[in-house]
Amino acid sequence: MPRRRVVGQRKILPDPKFNSELLAKFINVIMQDGKKSTAEKIIYKALDTVAEKKSEDHLVILEAALENVRPSVEVKSRRVGGSTYQVPCEVRPVRRNALGMRWLVEAARKRGEKSMALRLAGELLDASENKGTAVKKREDVHRMAEANKAFAHYRW
């Protein structure tokens, strides 16, 4: 690790349509092979579909969905002696957002709808109502942390 200075977090430019940094980050998570305009089309179409069905603001729905998917604790492997323990740790806010977005996108990609925009819209709707694959993933991670609470004293 370098000893000179701590490198700061890069400032991300907000997306052009809604002027939201969170949405810009989400676009970057969706993007594949550097095709940003395609990723933007997918997200905007998904948000329009969701807003049409729920008759709420686009960003409010996205924020609600993310809030229900973000994990507050996770487990990390820690080797002590000859055995490996799954140690529960709190998740930092930046990682919390990143994991939530990643899980939403993964869950959307596994769905059966025709286009990615419809899949993402479906997953966002499910997540905002506290159901769906991404929320299940968060519940599994929380359950794992709860089960391994006995090893919390191995924290670093």
Curated annotation (Swiss-Prot):
Belongs to the universal ribosomal protein uS7 family. GO terms for cellular component: small ribosomal subunit. GO terms for molecular function: rRNA binding; structural constituent of ribosome; tRNA binding. It holds the Pfam family Ribosomal_S7. One of its GO terms (biological process) is translation. Part of the 30S ribosomal subunit. Contacts proteins S9 and S11. One of the primary rRNA binding proteins, it binds directly to 16S rRNA where it nucleates assembly of the head domain of the 30S subunit. Is located at the subunit interface close to the decoding center, probably blocks exit of the E-site tRNA. Keywords: Ribonucleoprotein, Ribosomal protein, RNA-binding, rRNA-binding, tRNA-binding. This is Small ribosomal subunit protein uS7. Gene3D superfamilies: Ribosomal protein S7 domain (1.10.455.10). InterPro entries: Ribosomal_uS7, Ribosomal_uS7_bac/org-type, Ribosomal_uS7_CS, Ribosomal_uS7_dom, Ribosomal_uS7_dom_sf. Transmembrane segments: none annotated.
